[in-house]
């Protein structure tokens, strides 16, 4: 049945901002998947280098992700900060790893109460905007704040174009009341982020191996970790099978028992990552990207 919208009454049903952002915070992200979602954006923006930093300040600790991608101008940044900024029905380039225009916001909100994005596009002035969930809760409005921590105002001076994502108010990672001298909390914070580093080395191993991007963790370059252990002598590689829809399946059989791990570093890392060699796993990769 064809609708004649001009003859119908309407009512505004704009979602309440304070309630909606709390819903965004509960979309099932772990710290690992949240940070890799941000890295997806950097790669989609054509970054050759990504720098990840963590600054311990107790409950005021900060995590930053900086890239040398194409960057954004003022209007582009506001659009990127808008929830649902991308229509999933629109055609995407094969290098675009996003889909709904929610990842930057939902991934960040799942871990922190304050998301600042500072970006510089070639031939444009640097721009920054912040989502502050405490401000949203207070005003119940979808309003950004033009604010950036003072210590980061010159953070893009060393790149001609790029973007810096700043997470502060990390209430899902650390108690806001935590003291900077709390050693146990500092160790826990470091341990959580070490897990993220390992996750990144696995999730983006193809990108790193193919030299699509270099990822630096606290100034040290992350090495790729290939979960298939293809270069290990005792790994059995099965023939590739092509199935419906252009999907190909390839099997890898790793040694059942842990032997001579010192001589087989990838297997040793497999034990550290998975906990056991006998664990069956399936990995889905967007191979056409490369």
Residue ranges and their predicted role:
Residues 1-58, 75-78:
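Bergerat-fold GHKL ATPase/HATPase_c domain
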Residues 43-92, 99:
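Conserved beta-strand-loop-beta-strand hairpin that lines the nucleotide-binding pocket
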Residues 48-50, 59, 113, 161-163, ...:
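Residues at beta-strand starts and edge strands
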Residues 55-57, 68-70, 112, 120-122, ...:
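An acidic- and aromatic-residue-enriched active-site/binding cleft used to recognize and process polar
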Residues 73-75, 169, 174-176, 224-226, ...:
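Short helix/loop capping segments that flank catalytic or ligand/cofactor-binding pockets
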Residues 90-219:
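GHKL-type ATPase core
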Residues 185, 189, 197-198, 208-290:
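GHKL/Bergerat-fold ATPase module in large chromosome/replication-associated machines
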